[in-house]
Amino acid sequence: MAPTNLTKKPSQYKQSSRKGKKAWRKNIDLSDVEQYMEKKIDHEITHGTSDITSLQNDALFHVDVEGDEILKNKLIKRKQIKKVLKSKEILDAVKTNSKIAALNHHKNSSGNPNKIQGVSKHELKKLMALAGRVHGESKIKNRVAKDGLVKTTAGDLWGEESNSKKQKVKLPSGIKLDVEKKDQIPEELLKKSTTSWSTASVRPSTLDIEPIAVKEFTEIPHAGKSYNPNNKAWSELINKEYKEEKAREDERIALEKYKERIRHLMETLDDNEEEESSSNEEEEEEEEENENENESTQCSGSDKEIKLSINKPVKNKKKTKYQRNKAKRHEEKVKLQQELKELRQRVKDLEEVINSEETEILSAIESDSNKVKKSKKNKKHKLGTKYSVIDERLEIKFSDELSDSLRKLKPEGNLLYDTVRKLQSSGKVETRVPVRKGRKYKQKITEKWTHKDFK
């Protein structure tokens, strides 16, 4: 039963009480309570109980099977669904509502005594004979009768002929030839290659040798390089990178100082030094002779005086400016020669170490030729060229550069750079540096004399 639509009282103007507590109690608004009570009465009329939560779903809802007729007619007009004819509706109603079974055609009837599951007995006997289920009949004979097989030698139609008069010969270069059996093939053709190449017959020993580990390469980056790193890992990375960069900077500064020193020596030590020194020496000798003459005159005058000692008096002979400069230059020359000597000795020691390492490697290869070699570490980080493996880039962020969210994150590193460094470190690729092609000959500047034609 549908809920009854109760007409509500017309709403009146609500004025706040002007009297007191009694008037307020008298004029209180009870519209919400009245609505709730009316709803309860409606539920009691429609569902038989005021509390509908205790009822099952079947009592509250029902499924509409028929559908909306108005909507159906609209869809038929738009040709979105087909219109069901009245005759078909009557026949469908008879089919569903009639208690008498429909008539079956003799062709569709399954109660044929000569057929088993729709297969005739004659056809079934043939199938049983092919399967070898009939007593007294051969399975092979039935198969031959059906397929028409003939007993012959088994042979692959697309394969090689078994009774062929030709044989295949493989040359050292890998070329295959069809040669008749009666023909004799020369041994030179079988042993020596007729082309500029030949197929490998022996397994190369280099397959057992691992590539040389030129430089250590870490696959997983340091934890301090994360976009949100741990404080301990980040400080470790900062200290590590600082030490490496400081060592490089100290080496660079020392090299610059050494170059500046050599340049200064080359500027101060001129080629005309010997000529200048000889002229200065002559001047100094003349000065010394004059001093000796003065001393002799003084001595002759002082012979008359009384002497306490037989020996000549000791005099502090002061060096001239030229002598001091000469001694200073000599000291610098000696020091430079000593440094060059030490450098030569160091280079010689390095060459001896390299030669000894090479001899050790050769002896190890000869002794353990069949064993798999371990990866050798190269101390100089060089392979095949004079250039060492490219260094790892400085990929570190300071405390103010660290981002607290992925939106502010800036990508670091270069995948191509890391791949090349990995290939160079593992010894698979040699280190190369782009070099500009120089001039074959020096440019010659000449003055043209064409301006004389206008005079």
Swiss-Prot record:
The gene is NOP53. Interacts with CBF5, FPR3, FPR4, NOP2, PIH1, RRN3, RRP6 and PAP2. Interacts with pre-60S ribosomal particles. Residues 1-15 have a biased composition (Polar residues). Present with 1600 molecules/cell in log phase SD medium. It holds the Pfam family Nop53. This is Ribosome biogenesis protein NOP53. GO terms for cellular component: nuclear exosome (RNase complex); nucleolus; nucleoplasm; nucleus. The modification Phosphoserine is found at S31. Residues 268-294 have a biased composition (Acidic residues). Keywords: Nucleus, Phosphoprotein, Ribosome biogenesis, RNA-binding, rRNA processing. Residues 1-25, 264-333 are annotated as: Disordered. One of its GO terms (biological process) is ribosomal large subunit assembly. The keyword Cell membrane does not apply.
